[in-house]
Amino acid sequence: MLKLTPRQAEILAFIKRCLEDNGFPPTRAEIAQELGFKSPNAAEEHLKALARKGAIEMTPGASRGIRIPGLEAKAEEAGLPIIGRVAAGAPILAEQHIEQSCNINPAFFHPQADYLLRVHGMSMKDVGIFDGDLLAVHTCREARNGQIVVARIGDEVTVKRFKREGSKVWLLAENPEFAPIEVDLKEQELVIEGLSVGVIRR
């Protein structure tokens, strides 16, 4: 690893503390707040510099996609973070707020889970995903037709079955009481946050 600047060393120490205390890394916003940066973008630039120097590894597109080589085992022992609630009905505003940690090995799921999302609503009940369940999610940005995804539309997220034809995407409920959500990618942005890889009943 190349020599770090004092500021980079501060950031690395903060990331280590979060991993050791919580089992998951901080967001860019949390780093900015801790270190007194004006915006998360400043934290992002420092993280990129740390990655170039080999001090950390970054997962593109994931708000907590930061790893420190050698500390993965401790993170696994701490389990998976439980992140807020995700609408399995009408979409709700999704702020990635970690409620607590669940003591389960991420490797229990395949592919490996990155976090757990609390489900709110009954739109996916016919595939066994109920209100209050914890959905194990593997972070990725692409999905195939038929997969159950966590999708972001604007600042809101929802859990649905994915279907795409050309520029049209349908997010399908597994409950006849809920209508499909139709998105035209030419007019509206839709982001795949991850794939469902399991459910923990609560």
Swiss-Prot record:
GO terms for molecular function: DNA binding; serine-type endopeptidase activity. Keywords: Autocatalytic cleavage, DNA damage, DNA repair, DNA replication, DNA-binding, Hydrolase, Repressor, SOS response, Transcription, Transcription regulation. It comes from the Bacteria. The active site is at 123 (for autocatalytic cleavage activity), 160 (for autocatalytic cleavage activity). Its EC number is 3.4.21.88. The keyword Transcription applies. Pfam families: LexA_DNA_bind, Peptidase_S24. Residues 28-48 bind DNA. One of its GO terms (biological process) is negative regulation of DNA-templated transcription. InterPro entries: LexA (IPR006200), LexA-like (IPR039418), LexA/Signal_pep-like_sf (IPR036286), LexA_DNA-bd_dom (IPR006199), LexA_repressor (IPR050077), Peptidase_S24_LexA (IPR006197), Peptidase_S24_S26A/B/C (IPR015927), WH-like_DNA-bd_sf (IPR036388). Belongs to the peptidase S24 family. PANTHER family: LEXA REPRESSOR (PTHR33516), LEXA REPRESSOR-RELATED (PTHR33516:SF2). HAMAP family: LexA (MF_00015). Represses a number of genes involved in the response to DNA damage (SOS response), including recA and lexA. In the presence of single-stranded DNA, RecA interacts with LexA causing an autocatalytic cleavage which disrupts the DNA-binding part of LexA, leading to derepression of the SOS regulon and eventually DNA repair. This is LexA repressor 1. The gene is lexA1.
